[in-house]
Amino acid sequence: MTEPIISFKDFSFQYHSQATPTLQNINVDIYPGEKVLVVGASGSGKSTFANCINGLIPFKTKGNVTGELHINNQDATVSCLHKRSNVVGTVLQDTDGQFIGLTAAEDMAFLLENNCVEQDDMKKNVSYWAEKVDMIEHLNHRPQDLSGGQKQRVSLGGILIHRTPILILDEPLANLDPATGHETLRLLNNIHEETKSTMIIVEHRLEESLDDTFDRVLLFKDGKIIANTTPSDLLKSSKLKEAGIREPLYCTALKYAEVDVESIDNLANLREVCMSEHVKFKVKKWIDKTSSNDDNKYKSEPLLELNEVCVQYSDYSNSVLNNVQLAEVDVESIDNLANLREVCMSEHVKFKVKK
């Protein structure tokens, strides 16, 4: 039987500044090559859990440790941060604090320089992993010239050069827009498939991060693991609600459409779910019914009501809107309805309001 590469046994940790333990009686094994998602609400203990693995706890951040933690068959509590970094690579949420070099290339080559690797080999390694993380065109750029997603990729490339068997990513989607976040997850999955490393992703944005490429999900609540299961089984359970985590909206939609989610084999794979003819039929029926009800509702309700609305900007002497009572404006025709200034500058809106 394969030995776990990470093993927690009755493990608890309490910060010196806290009155109660942040982690309580953690018992979990993670095996070589697994891809694990760690989720939980803010303050649930998920980042502390990750820091115990990468060595920031207890070697940098002090506290009281009880129980056992073994990493790569070594007692993690008697090692040191330097030795741990040879086994566990971490991409921090704040990549600015992890950037060391003056350029992207220098940052990725930092460890190779410390290990006195030959220049030719160093350049080959940097180019290889820069290509893998899609940063080959930005190697000569300074940190301040890179976006948050690009800095993250540089940090990831520097970790991959070290080829550690365990890779931790602490909230990799935190500072990314949805499109970049999706691309980042695709990149991480490709890297996991190529390197066969043990990958642990810590996230609170469940809907954006969860899919069926994860072997397991660890769900934290109040410093405890309340679920250790597959993505699909987690979505079928009530554990997310118990932990204060909103389930993916498509799961909610399926329930509104009266789809039996328990009967769906791979609920974590949205594409497979959408290909089911039974699901298509149920969802279409629900949408048609909802749309019909909405049409009847809006026939008897105004699209927009204004009641004594006044608007004046600091750089304008006159009011843009002054005691407006009602304006039947077609809000569907307004491109940027969320921008009040743009709305008020529209000639169509001005005419309707004046009228």
Whereabouts are the PLM-identified features?
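Conserved ABC ATPase "signature" region
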Residues: 120-138
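Hydrophobic anchor residue at the start of the ABC signature
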Residues: 156-157, 184
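Conserved ABC ATPase signature
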Residues: 142-146, 150
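Helix N-cap at the start of a conserved alpha-helix in ABC-type nucleotide-binding domains
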Residues: 178-180
